[in-house]
Amino acid sequence: MAGCFRFVKEENTMTWRIVHICQSEKMQLKLDNLLIKKMGQDYIIPLSDISIIVAEGGETVVTLRLLSALSKYNIALIVCDNEHLPTGIYHSQNGHFRAYKKLQEQLLWTQEQKDKLWQIVTYFKINNQQDVLSMFEKNIDCIQLLANYKDHIEYGDKTNREGHAAKVYFNELFGKKFVRLTQQETDVINAGLNYGYAIMRAQMARIISGYGLNPLIGIFHKNEYNQFNLVDDLMEPFRQIIDVWVYQNLRDEEYLKYEFRLALTDTLNAKIRYGKETCSVTVAMDKYVKGFLKCISDKDTSKFYCPMVSSVEWS
């Protein structure tokens, strides 16, 4: 079974398996189940148990009936290329029974609201970057510089503290010669970061869609070609979970091997401190989006917390 797929259980979520499929021949719908065909063997998983499917292998056939069912169950499908790197996400566009009302509300978000929320999200992100450098006992001057950036973020981050912090952070974490690449992955560090970020992005997309939000309409990102502007906004403080895993596991490696890809998928099940409780990353994401919505509807930031990356424990 390991050659066909792996799955892991998520804590306290209505859908709880992340299915990693490698070199299967066909994925199709059988009643309300995912049917995986591999070398004459059939593997069946109830769709109600699945949150994400990661599919590798260029010869796999996926039926339209299955794609329709994945949308119905709000299951994200991540498709990987021949280098095993994620290149696309298929997700539901109808995850909420009052989608039109939610869209109307989202379109009424004011620029002031969006700028304030982006200020908070940027603070969370730089705070976690600072904590990561502290975890690994990096240069104290760089850590203090991030602290300074964090404490001087304007509404909407008009002075781009996020961008300045990112340069300092990556150069200190992975070395002065490190260059962050998102398209032409030339090294195992970038490959690991991109793979892990794609997993986080898919999970955030399905959670956001499940709450009736349109992922196209962000609070900061506004790329007309990006279907996930809001996802890319909100996932920023969760990226550092992947940074920590990559730093701990890939610095001495040459390739992003299969076991590493599985482990990166499993980061969604890592334990993390969110507010006053410790929960899985997936549960923290869900609570985080709820807190974001509370900020929008009631101007109440008391339930919108920074996920504490320094507390992460791998499952």
Question: What are these language model-derived features?
Answer:
Residues 5-42, 165:
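N-terminal, Lys/Arg-enriched amphipathic/low-complexity engagement segments
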